[in-house]
């Protein structure tokens, strides 16, 4: 006993559930890499042999491979659901966040069953928007279940939020659009015009600086 106080910091545990690694790579990598500096982050995803797709994700992030199918498959979906419930019970996450319809449905049910305190889903589009008849009604019902079982709902645009409200899927008081709307924001450094290149092109084309193009 050295007499020194030993402090063990237990980070809050967060799980992010997506159907494919492409979603995490393209839309969520920046958020995940930021979150992992403050929280214990786990990605639950169907890798399907594409582990390299997550090479832009911090190695501090835990990755669990789960066979979630994008399309409806009763037996595969039930298996994924029970596996999710088991994972949630075992890890005792404080928050789970799902993106994409299938991941959203299975995660919301599993997290509700496992009594995860905070359950968040992000709507990025509706597979039923162009459907008609019973198929449209059924798929819309699944989105309503997602809304009912989650404690928080994010929508990636105001137009989509208005559409979902109009269709009776959710209400404005239980859904949030961050900022001006976007699933992952815009990298302003990447899309910032280059003044050097601008001046070079204007010089090559003999265009004066005060000319509006």
Task: Provide a role label for each language-model segment.
Residues 16-76, 163, 168, 174-176:
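N-terminal strand-loop element at the rim of the active site
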Residues 45, 98, 154-158:
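Short beta-strand scaffold positions
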Residues 13-18, 111-127, 143, 154, ...:
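Active-site proximal beta-strand in glycosyltransferases
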Residues 4-12, 56, 192-213:
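Nucleotide-sugar donor-binding and catalytic loop/hinge architecture
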Residues 98-104:
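Short His-centered aromatic/hydrophobic patch
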Residues 87-94, 207-208:
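Glycine-rich phosphate-binding loop signature in dinucleotide/nucleotide-binding domains
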């Amino acid at each position: 006993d050295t007499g020194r106080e030993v402090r063990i910091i237990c980070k809050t545990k967060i799980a992010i559930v997506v159907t494919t690694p492409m979603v995490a790579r393209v839309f969520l990598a920046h958020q995940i890499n930021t979150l992992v500096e403050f929280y214990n982050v786990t990605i639950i995803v169907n890798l399907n042999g594409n582990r390299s797709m997550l090479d832009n994700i911090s190695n501090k992030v835990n990755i669990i491979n789960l066979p979630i199918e994008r399309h409806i498959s009763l037996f595969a979906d039930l298996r994924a659901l029970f596996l999710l419930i088991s994972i949630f019970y075992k890890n005792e996450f404080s928050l789970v966040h799902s993106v994409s319809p299938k991941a959203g449905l299975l995660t919301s049910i599993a997290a509700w069953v496992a009594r995860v305190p905070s359950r968040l889903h992000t709507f990025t589009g509706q597979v039923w928007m162009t459907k008609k008849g019973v198929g449209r009604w059924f798929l819309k019902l699944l989105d309503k279940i997602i809304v009912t079982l989650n404690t928080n709902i994010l929508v990636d645009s105001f137009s989509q939020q208005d559409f979902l409200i109009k269709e009776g899927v959710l209400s404005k008081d239980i859904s949030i659009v961050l900022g001006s709307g976007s699933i992952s924001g815009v990298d302003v450094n990447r899309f910032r015009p280059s003044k050097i290149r601008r001046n070079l092109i204007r010089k090559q084309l003999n265009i004066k600086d005060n000319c509006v193009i």
